[in-house]
Structure formats: C-alpha cells, structure tokens
Curated annotation (Swiss-Prot):
This is Glutamate-1-semialdehyde 2,1-aminomutase. It is found in: Cytoplasm. It comes from Aromatoleum aromaticum (strain DSM 19018 / LMG 30748 / EbN1). It catalyses: (S)-4-amino-5-oxopentanoate = 5-aminolevulinate. The gene is hemL. Keywords: Cytoplasm, Isomerase, Porphyrin biosynthesis, Pyridoxal phosphate. Its cofactor is pyridoxal 5'-phosphate. Its EC number is 5.4.3.8. Its main location: cytoplasm.
Length: 427
C-alpha cells in the first residue's frame, strides 16, 4: 500500500521542483521517500502517516528549546493578535537587538533580516563597502547561504548532490572568491601575502557544520584574526548555525576570538524566519540610512518572528540550560560511539554544545578531505535503519545534527538502544 508520505511526495514533484523547497529535504543523498511532517512537539516529530520520530534535525538547528515550546507558541500568538506585519519599526525589534548586543561579545550594532542567506550576503556587501576591496576568502565545504559569490565549493546541500559549486553563478562573480582549505592556516597566510591588498573579508563557519561537524584546529581562528588585523581585512564569523547553539556566546565566546562581523539565524528566530548581522560600530554605521551600503527588507524585523526569537533567547538564559543541553548531546555521541565500537563498525562522533557530528570513519574529521573520505554508503544504511526505528537524523552525511533541551536522558537511551541493533546488523 502506498504511504501518505509517498503520495504527498508524488504530488509535490508535480508543482515544486524536486518536490521540496530546500534540496537536502528530498533524500536524494540517502535515497528513499522524504518524510512529510504533520506536527512536532518537544523532541519528536510525526510524519504524514502518523509515525513518531525522536528528532535530531530540529528544523536544521532553530528548535533548540524543542518543538512547539509553550513560551514561544504563546509569544507568537500574542504578537499575531497585535498584527502580522507593520513595515515600520516596533519596540520588539529594539528589544531583540539590545539582547543580541548584550549576549554576543563582538556585536555593538545589529541589523535584522529574514534569513541566514540575507545575513551573510549583506555582511559581504558591507565588508566590501567598508574596505573598498572586492575579493572574499571562504573555505571549501563551508556553506554561507545561496548568494552567488558564496556558492563556490560550498558544502552542505551542494555536496549532497555531488556538485561542489552551483550552476548559474557567473564566472565574473566567482573570480572574486578565493577558496581555501579549512584548518590550513599556512594556505591562508600564502593567499594574504599574494593578494592581501585585494581582500575585503574572510568569512568562515568558525565551527563548520555544513560538511558535517568539523572543529577548528588550535591556532586556526587565532591566525585568521591576526592576519585580518594585519591586512585590514574584515573577519566575518558565520554563526548562523552555531550562534547560541554551541554556547551562550557562540563560537566567539567559546574560543575568545572577536570577529569584526557576525552573521546569525536559526536559534534567534525560535523557528520563525529571522537572520541578523552585526559587529563593530564603525563598520555597521556604513549601512543605509547612515552610510552608502544599501540593505533593506519588507519583512525584516517581522513582529511575529521577532516575538518568537525573543522568547527563544530568554529561554536560553535560564540557569543550567547549556549545561543540560551539552550533557544530553555528550550522552548521545558517547553512546553511539560505544555501540558502534562494540559491533566492530568503523565510526566516530563529536559534539559541541547542542550540535553533533557522526562519521563513518576511524577518526573525527579535521578537514574537508577527511569528511569526503568517510564511508557514505555506511551512513546511508545507518540513516534508513534508524529512520525505520523511529529516530530522525539529518538525511545527508554532510550535515551536523542537533539536540534540544526537550530531549531527555530516556530519549537518548532509546536512540542508543536502536543504534546498537542497527550497528549489529551493519557490522
């Protein structure tokens, strides 16, 4: 009998390219039929056939407090009753801007947008306007949204389909993008010596999450900061994924390294479409209406989305929030690694805060090349077996996973028990 998921996917493919509104959702990397989600609550999602899953996708990061958290739902309800969109400033915009500036150590001023892509696109434009230079340094496997100049060896969904770069990006745009290897500081130093006077910005996922989870090697971020300061280059930390996810001050708080600009998204929207970019006051004052760098958006600062974001950020400030989140995530990765080891399966796992990576490789990857050398076929078999058992991991070997505050120790134990059975079959 055809499942409701299959029926919906067949319908969707007739009116939506690939049947999805973001490519990784199509399950092309892992094969099979994507799950159409009908509802979500706490640590679980339910598909169109009524099957429940312990969820480790978390809407790709935003659901840090769990799905449909009552405080966030109530904040959205109250805001919606007062009006869905004004196209004018509101007090809530000021509230969330002040809170972001208070929480993020490098941000002195912040501009709200409606997505992470808008945030990184605007930050790049601002860096170019501020420096008067054109070239941008990015790192292979790091994804910064789908702006043309950043869709070069961009990881994430592009890797899922075997294409490191996107069609439709003019060579004239791409020529200003210098792509280097993540965690290779010597390569960055060489590029700066050769072209330092042309470089407007270095943009980096300070902890990579779009080629699975890859942490910076000791000295890498410090070296980027040193070189950018020396050459007058704007250092941009893309914390769309890691901001408020890996800790209360993001990666910059964990490592004590201050970028010039930071891009945010996901968690700051509480599940609604919100992004932001912010940083040094002297740079941010170049944005219109104060300066010549133009940026605008009809729904930027949406009162409903901002209400969700404010409620989400307030939850993160509760005592013990990050300690408990980190404990659950550590429980998951250590349990999965132990289960794989007991079954003789080549496997490793890593985590930071509420973010984790699973790899079918003997060691945790330290580079894009390491990630590409992992066993993707083994991951695909693991993914489907866990999905059948009611545990929803990201449908790609190149995506990080997420734990929420709603996950209990019992939820994690249930996942580890299922994984033990799966690894026994894989071994």
């Amino acid at each position: 009998m055809t499942s409701r998921n299959e029926t919906l996917f067949q319908r969707a493919q007739k009116s939506i390219p690939g049947g999805v509104n973001s490519p990784v959702r199509a399950f092309r990397s892992v094969g099979g039929t994507p799950r159409f989600i009908s509802r979500a609550e706490g640590a679980r999602v339910w598909d169109a056939d009524g099957k429940a899953y312990v969820d480790y996708v978390g809407s790709w990061g935003p659901a840090i407090a769990g799905h449909a958290h009552p405080a966030i739902v109530e904040a959205v309800r109250e805001a919606a009753l007062a009006g869905l969109s004004f196209g004018a400033p509101s007090e809530a915009e000021v509230d969330i801007a002040e809170l972001i500036c208070e929480l993020m150590p490098s941000i002195e001023m912040v501009r709200l947008v409606s997505s992470g892509t808008e945030a990184t696109m605007s930050a790049i434009r601002l860096a170019r306007g501020f420096t008067g230079r054109d070239a941008i340094v990015k790192f292979e496997g790091c994804y910064h949204g789908h702006a043309d100049s950043l869709l070069v060896k961009a990881g994430s969904g592009l890797l899922t389909f075997g294409n490191p770069s996107s069609g439709g990006v003019p060579a004239d745009f791409a020529k200003h993008t210098i792509v280097l290897d993540y965690n290779d500081l010597q390569q960055v130093e060489d590029a700066f010596r050769a072209r330092g006077g042309e470089i407007a910005a270095v943009i980096v996922e300070a902890i990579a999450g779009n080629m699975n989870l890859v942490k910076p090697l000791p000295g890498f971020l410090e070296g980027l900061r040193r070189l950018c300061t020396e050459y007058g280059v704007v250092l941009i930390f893309d914390e769309v994924m890691t901001g408020f996810r890996v800790g209360p001050q993001g990666v910059q708080g964990l490592y004590g390294i201050m970028p010039d600009l930071t891009t945010l998204g996901k968690v700051i929207g509480g599940g609604m479409p919100v992004g932001a970019f912010g940083g040094r006051r002297d740079i941010m004052e170049k944005i219109a209406p104060l300066g010549s760098v133009y940026q605008a958006g009809t729904l930027s600062g949406s009162p409903v989305a901002v209400a969700a974001g404010l409620a989400s950020l307030k939850l993160l400030r509760e005592p013990g929030f990050y300690e408990n989140l980190g404990a659950r995530t550590t429980q998951l990765v250590t349990g999965l690694a132990a289960a794989a080891n007991d079954a003789g399966v080549t496997f490793s796992a890593d985590s930071v805060g509420g973010m984790f990576g699973v790899y079918f490789s003997a060691a945790v990857p330290k580079s894009f090349a390491d990630v590409m050398a992992s066993d993707r076929d083994a991951f695909n078999r693991f993914f489907h077996a866990m999905l059948d058992a009611g545990h929803y991991f990201a449908p790609s070997a190149f995506e990080a996973g997420f734990v929420s505050a709603a996950h209990t120790a019992a939820d994690i134990d249930e996942t580890i028990a299922a994984a033990r059975e799966v690894f026994a079959r894989l071994g």
